[in-house]
A protein has these predicted regions:
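Polar/acidic, low-complexity leader/linker segments enriched in S/T/G and N/D
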Residues: 1-45
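Short amphipathic beta-strand/extended segments with alternating polar/hydrophobic composition
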Residues: 6, 18-28, 104-111, 221-231, ...
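A short, compositionally biased
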Residues: 4-9, 87-92, 206-207
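Short, acidic/charged, Gly/Pro-enriched secondary-structure junctions
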Residues: 71-115, 280
Length: 300
């Protein structure tokens, strides 16, 4: 016997299409629910030459799948066609569950299956039945929709706000101070990359050496750093950004990234990430003043 989920577990959205507007509802078959706590992993191993067993070199997360059981009671022909259009797309879309509306997965819909009976009602064809929607997240983690609780207007906020790890409001976080320091906080489950943006002089005046560090407030020890030689702009660049996901220093202008790279100006140090769920971290910059820092919270 299928049981419709109650309360905040009843809905989800895909590609900004709400489940209730599509005429469907999530259901249970009456047994316990299954959920993967973490994405699928793939071990990196090499067989021991001439011996037993394998050498283990760690694991990589690969992908994550979601299967959603649904039911529909009075689905019209128009809604049936809309289901085909929404879940038949080959493009990636945002999947958001109502019980955790602070994060989204980028997923692809695949093999939606429906079982139904069809009958007439008031001169219109009506569908009643059940089905399964399957989604694959090739990037296996979720990202934050917003970063601070006051940006959410969900009625069930009290149920998930603590689990989200988010701060009530932005306050002084992510703002460049006069001395070049930026207070950062990562509410996610995993360390997160960031993009740090700088402007370049309009003329060809070179900028001086730049040092970027990660440390905790009121603690002198640097946990990570990246040092750059002074350099001048290239071509039509109006700025550059340090991207710790791609490990690139990229030029940009008003039209976007220009394809110019400045990695040859790295003297020493490494690209680094922001640790999760730890208070007091700040990114300090000397030699230049950033104009913006951009990062997401990454969740399982």
């Amino acid at each position: 016997m299928a049981i419709a989920l109650k309360g905040d577990f009843i809905g989800f959205s895909f590609n900004e299409h709400r489940s209730e507007s599509l005429g469907i509802v999530r259901i249970s078959d009456g047994s316990r629910y299954n959920e993967d706590l973490v994405p699928t992993t793939q071990d990196k191993t090499v067989q021991v030459p001439g011996g037993d067993g394998f050498y283990y070199f760690g694991s990589d997360y690969t992908q994550r799948q979601f299967s959603i059981n649904i039911a529909f009671d009075e689905l019209t022909e128009k809604q049936f066609r809309e289901l085909q259009q929404v879940f038949g797309t080959k493009e990636l879309g945002k999947l958001i569950f109502d019980e955790r509306p602070y994060k989204y997965y980028m997923v692809k819909s695949s093999k939606p299956q429906l079982k139904y009976i069809c009958f007439g009602k008031d001169g219109e064809r009506i569908y009643k039945g059940e089905g399964t929607l399957t989604f694959t997240a090739y990037y296996p983690f979720a990202k934050s929709i917003f970063k601070f609780l006051n940006e959410y207007g969900n009625k069930n906020k009290d149920e998930w706000k603590e689990a989200s790890g988010m701060k009530p409001e932005k306050g002084t976080y992510d703002i460049v101070s006069n001395n070049g320091s930026i207070s950062v906080y990562n509410a996610g489950d995993l360390e997160t990359d960031f993009i740090l943006k700088f402007s370049l002089p309009i003329d060809n005046t070179p900028i001086g050496d730049i040092k970027i560090t990660l440390s905790k407030e009121n603690v002198g020890k640097e946990e990570a750093f990246l040092d750059l030689n002074g350099f001048s702009k290239k071509g039509a660049d109006t700025g550059f950004q340090i991207n710790t996901k791609t490990n690139l220093i990229e030029g940009f202008n008003a039209e976007g990234l220009t394809g110019t790279l400045y990695n040859e100006n790295i003297i020493q140090g490494d690209f680094f990430k922001i640790p999760p769920r730890e208070e007091g971290y700040q990114i300090n910059v000397t030699g230049a003043t950033p104009i913006e820092i951009v990062y997401d919270y990454i969740y399982y």
